[in-house]
Amino acid sequence: MNKYRQKLVTFGGGTGQFHLLDGLRDLNETSFITSVASTWDSGGSSGRLRTELGVLPPGDIRRCLLALMEDKEQRKVAQRLFDDRLEEVSGPLRGHSLGNLITARLDNIYRGQDRGIDAERKLFRINAKVLPATLTDVELIAETSSGLKISGETNIDYRVKDKDFDPKDKIVRIYFDSRTDTNEKVIESIRDAHKLIFSPGDLYTSILPHLLVDGVSEAINKSKAKLIIVLNLATKKGETDNFKASDYLKAFSFYLGGGNRIDYLIINDNHLDAEIVETYRNEGQNLVEIDEEKCIKIAPKMKIIKKDVAMYLKNDHLLRHDPVKLAEAILSL
């Protein structure tokens, strides 16, 4: 199969970026793909390694590396290895993801996460590039409409579990606790790209923080690459409650310094069963409503691309982007 040879740069974190890369890997030459991974995770195995070893959080980097392995059988084995958690051991290693430990250890051995990632790419024969968003150890802070300040990505993520949580107290601003050093390799990749893609994912804790990193939004605004945003399928409780498509675009526009830079918004347009809608509603989430007129007012030059890009994992009751369909939609633009 002939593959596309588009220079692509993706920004994101979590499962959203994983599924995006999973599709792009099979349809585009991987040596033309650069994935920028988030590095401000403060919880779980990643957060512990960050505290205990002084490394940048390895979780999202691990996911990107896994998604970009081209050999299917190798990827299957690596997934079992990377996702294995050491629950049967006692002591400080208990609960750690083995993949996180490998990434963190290479960081220490090669004296820097960027060099450690390159070593891991060689180890697993990964042609695509994976870059940390920043090499600075930073804490993400969110401010709500009441003036409440929440420090740490995990604390922002889990604020819904607080007994005093008020869904009307919305996040209005995010920032880092200190200035971030620019990762020049990220800036170079943006400069050389044909397409810049923001993956689906947690808006305020995974996606928008990329635009807080020094030099990134400026480089995007100077770039001639097409800027593509993949709209989330559903809202997230405590983060994007009752958000419509225009609310997502407002947030992007704010951190980009205006909506004129956005070229494409990819949305799902296939019919989703009432069962799916009800399942998500019971979890305090809604499918994202598309208010086209407001979207165009925010980003006048933007084209809305409507495609069947969703899949429902019935056994897990999860709505996800279909990797291949999403990649096809992006590469065809």
Where are the predicted features?
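Metallocofactor- and cofactor-centric catalytic cores in central/energy metabolism, strongly enriched
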Residues: 2, 15-18, 26-28, 32-35, ...
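Non-transmembrane, aqueous-exposed alpha-helical and coiled segments at domain scale
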Residues: 1-7, 22-25, 31-32, 40, ...
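An anion/phosphate-binding loop that grips the pyrophosphate of nucleotide cofactors and donors
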Residues: 193
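Charged helix-capping and loop-helix junction motifs
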Residues: 210-217, 243-248
